[in-house]
């Protein structure tokens, strides 16, 4: 709530992803952690599990504030509102250790700048505070800000064991933490089309499936098995997982004054241009940010450079910012677009 009593909800999410090093026991698996243990972890975040879906490779959880994904040695938590995901790290690491994973290989914490930062709760009242909190657990972490700090920006904190200088006696113990191909694309959208957003109100559809089909969400990545939820009176979340263990997730805050939609997937593609166009055509934002992470084993590691080209020339999108970063194990592309009056393809 705002100080004057008017309604507000922070759609911008905090995204936390952790990869653990392979354990010596092949039977170790984060998916062995019980639901009750996950509920205890999430109680520190101030969110609850609404529904679950799973296959042989990945477990997906729709939460009261966004989503969680668990695979053998990877954990992803994405939460919106005034949630506090960093506060669950201590408990999470203890659970992981109890299930055979005692070394973090890579950690990523990221978020866009908040619409109402003053409404957030410690340790999320500012990126400096978040970095201080993370540094207390991961003393070799690194923090970044991409985009314009006084306008729209995207914050990132990373930790990687490959950043740590390995002494000779530890070389024989060093694992290949980059053995699994990994890529993630996020599309963060604002100022959405009101007619499209009206689909995600309970007075329009009684169940989430109606909104999923009407909006065309089900056609974005057709191989995904969808678990969706429509909030009362408005708002929408969905998780999709496929037989390869890949995921997608969409979260929608439809209120016109602060509309926000996030799309995320780790589907491996050699070119993300078509996918970006489909997502943007589905939700029709006024502006959006694209981020793509890809490690050296990923199909997208080299081909993500396609988006470094100014595809928006001649279209009704103007690229207002673009930055690339090279990390020890990953490449990152950040690009921001705003609407112009021209017509044509989105990218």
Swiss-Prot record:
<feature type="active site" description="Proton donor; for catalytic activity">
    <location>
        <position position="80"/>
    </location>
</feature>
<dbReference type="InterPro" id="IPR048283">
    <property type="entry name" value="AdoMetDC-like"/>
</dbReference>
<feature type="active site">
    <location>
        <position position="13"/>
    </location>
</feature>
<dbReference type="GO" id="GO:0006597">
    <property type="term" value="P:spermine biosynthetic process"/>
</dbReference>
<dbReference type="GO" id="GO:0008295">
    <property type="term" value="P:spermidine biosynthetic process"/>
</dbReference>
<keyword id="KW-0068">Autocatalytic cleavage</keyword>
<feature type="active site" description="Schiff-base intermediate with substrate; via pyruvic acid">
    <location>
        <position position="66"/>
    </location>
</feature>
<feature type="modified residue" description="Pyruvic acid (Ser); by autocatalysis">
    <location>
        <position position="66"/>
    </location>
</feature>
<dbReference type="GO" id="GO:0005829">
    <property type="term" value="C:cytosol"/>
</dbReference>
<dbReference type="InterPro" id="IPR016067">
    <property type="entry name" value="S-AdoMet_deCO2ase_core"/>
</dbReference>
<dbReference type="Pfam" id="PF01536">
    <property type="entry name" value="SAM_decarbox"/>
</dbReference>
<keyword id="KW-0704">Schiff base</keyword>
<feature type="active site" description="Proton acceptor; for processing activity">
    <location>
        <position position="251"/>
    </location>
</feature>
<keyword id="KW-0210">Decarboxylase</keyword>
<protein>
    <recommendedName>
        <fullName>S-adenosylmethionine decarboxylase proenzyme</fullName>
        <ecNumber>4.1.1.50</ecNumber>
    </recommendedName>
</protein>
<keyword id="KW-0456">Lyase</keyword>
<feature type="active site">
    <location>
        <position position="10"/>
    </location>
</feature>
<keyword id="KW-0745">Spermidine biosynthesis</keyword>
<feature type="site" description="Cleavage (non-hydrolytic); by autolysis">
    <location>
        <begin position="65"/>
        <end position="66"/>
    </location>
</feature>
<keyword id="KW-0670">Pyruvate</keyword>
<dbReference type="GO" id="GO:0050829">
    <property type="term" value="P:defense response to Gram-negative bacterium"/>
</dbReference>
<comment type="pathway">
    <text>Amine and polyamine biosynthesis; S-adenosylmethioninamine biosynthesis; S-adenosylmethioninamine from S-adenosyl-L-methionine: step 1/1.</text>
</comment>
<keyword id="KW-0620">Polyamine biosynthesis</keyword>
<dbReference type="GO" id="GO:0004014">
    <property type="term" value="F:adenosylmethionine decarboxylase activity"/>
</dbReference>
<dbReference type="InterPro" id="IPR001985">
    <property type="entry name" value="S-AdoMet_decarboxylase_euk"/>
</dbReference>
<comment type="similarity">
    <text>Belongs to the eukaryotic AdoMetDC family.</text>
</comment>
<dbReference type="InterPro" id="IPR018166">
    <property type="entry name" value="S-AdoMet_deCO2ase_CS"/>
</dbReference>
<keyword id="KW-0865">Zymogen</keyword>
<keyword id="KW-0949">S-adenosyl-L-methionine</keyword>
<feature type="active site" description="Proton acceptor; for processing activity">
    <location>
        <position position="237"/>
    </location>
</feature>
